[in-house]
């Protein structure tokens, strides 16, 4: 009875807020297997930012640009597209001009809302990551040292690009996205 009460409360909260998370027990996400990941051109190129180790250069840049500073995230860049509040597409950065469509995989990321209370089109760019604790958990389950992943970024990249999104779901991929583009 307690589970049913909490489940009903969650349904009510999701309906009130318009937010339905991919990990919610109310989201009946079936797993999908693809034969290959389709490719798609980006509407706007997703080019790399210049790097600096100079505080002065960074201060000069920040003085003339609106910016957000964060720790370097070593993951995989992903673009999410919502139409009228529904997640309709997720594409990797790829070469900056052409990426791979990973929508079924993004729908099982640990923290991506499948629906949001927003009318119109909303495009978010973020970084898909796997935490060090999940990286260590997954590597610890692999017996052969030669088969272990070298770093969380390699594991994340392979997880995001899986043809079977059940594997993606088990790896706890998260997307960090600071602001709309």
Region locations from a protein language model:
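Structural signature of FAD isoalloxazine-binding scaffolds in flavoprotein oxidoreductases
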Residues: 166-176
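Phosphate/adenylate-binding "loop-and-lid" substructures adjacent to NTP/NAD/dNTP-binding pockets
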Residues: 1-116, 136, 154
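Short active-site loop/helix that positions an aromatic residue
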Residues: 9-10, 137-141, 160-163, 167
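Nucleic-acid 5′ end/cap handling module spanning
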Residues: 73, 79-82, 148-153, 157-168
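Conserved small/polar residues in nucleotide/adenosyl-binding loops
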Residues: 177-181
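Long, non-coiled-coil amphipathic alpha-helical linker/lever segments
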Residues: 118-129
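Short, hydrophobic/aliphatic alpha-helical segments
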Residues: 33, 137-150
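Extended, highly charged clamp/arch subdomains and adjacent linkers
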Residues: 133
